[in-house]
């Protein structure tokens, strides 16, 4: 029991000596280290973050351009598999966009109906341009060149071959 004796006590040993139901139990150290002995390094841009509750979480570095490109390619391949064609849809005033599978739709009317339901909005397109009111929105799309065009101005099949993104904007009508 002298001071010359060196002992390595863990937090579990020290906590078992105290009263687990007493007031001193709130001051004991409950941290636990989990070491699996896995050998993987941080040379590939992997960083470790505290995931809470004492766990470390491996996450790729934000600067790792190869990783970002691989994830984007994987997402694109996942979304555009055989029989599907997903495009992003953003609505003015809504901070989060959505994706919609155009191959599952049967034309412009089905697209408009789906977007009306998805965003709870009255959406106009080229065929219904004359029917406007104050709460209407206009559906446009970005083609391969990045030009924004009115949805419905070309046949559906041609639209599917050129569309890259959809945007729902407020219709600004000045009388």
Swiss-Prot record:
State if Ribosomal protein is listed as a keyword.
no
**Which intervals carry biased composition (Polar residues)?**
19-29
Please name the Pfam families in this protein's record. AUX_IAA (PF02309)
Tell me where the signal peptide lies: none
Residue span of region Disordered:
1-29
| GO MF terms held by the record | DNA-binding transcription factor activity; identical protein binding
This chain belongs to which protein, by name? Auxin-responsive protein IAA20
Explain the induction of this protein: By auxin.
> Motif EAR-like (transcriptional repression): residue span?
34-38
User: Which keywords, in A-to-Z order, does the entry hold?
Assistant: Auxin signaling pathway, Nucleus, Repressor, Transcription, Transcription regulation
What species does this protein belong to?
Answer: Arabidopsis thaliana
What's in the domain note? The N-terminal half of the protein contains two conserved domains I and II. Domain I includes a slightly degenerated ERF-associated amphiphilic repression (EAR) motif which seems to be involved in the activity of transcriptional repression. Domain II is required for the correct degradation of the protein through the SCF-mediated ubiquitin-proteasome pathway. Interactions between Aux/IAA proteins and auxin response factors (ARFs) occur through their C-terminal dimerization domains III and IV.
Can you supply a Gene Ontology BP term from the record?
gravitropism
Which family is this protein grouped under?
A: Belongs to the Aux/IAA family.
The entry describes its oligomerization and partners as: Homodimers and heterodimers.
Q: Which domain of life is it from?
A: Eukaryota
- Coding gene? IAA20
Protein role: Aux/IAA proteins are short-lived transcriptional factors that function as repressors of early auxin response genes at low auxin concentrations. Repression is thought to result from the interaction with auxin response factors (ARFs), proteins that bind to the auxin-responsive promoter element (AuxRE). Formation of heterodimers with ARF proteins may alter their ability to modulate early auxin response genes expression.
Query: Per the record's keyword annotation, is Transcription regulation included, yes or no?
Result: yes
Q: Where in the cell is it found?
A: Nucleus
CC annotations in GO: nucleus
Q: Where is the composition biased (Low complexity)?
A: 1-18
């Amino acid at each position: 029991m002298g001071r010359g004796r060196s002992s390595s006590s863990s937090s579990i040993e020290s906590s078992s000596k105290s009263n687990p139901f007493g007031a001193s139990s709130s001051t004991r150290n409950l941290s636990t280290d989990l070491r699996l002995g896995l050998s993987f390094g941080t040379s590939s841009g992997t960083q470790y973050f505290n995931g809470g509750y004492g766990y470390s979480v491996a996450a790729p570095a934000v600067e790792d351009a190869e990783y970002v490109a691989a994830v984007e390619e994987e997402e694109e391949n996942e979304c555009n598999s055989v029989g599907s064609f997903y495009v992003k849809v953003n609505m003015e005033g809504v901070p989060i966009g959505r994706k919609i599978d155009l191959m599952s739709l049967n034309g412009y009317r089905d697209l408009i109906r789906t977007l009306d339901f998805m965003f709870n909005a009255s959406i106009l397109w080229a065929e219904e341009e004359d029917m406007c009111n104050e709460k209407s929105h206009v559906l446009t799309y970005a083609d391969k060149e990045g030009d924004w065009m009115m949805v419905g101005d070309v046949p559906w099949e041609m639209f599917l071959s050129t569309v890259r993104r959809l945007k729902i904007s407020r219709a600004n009508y000045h009388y």
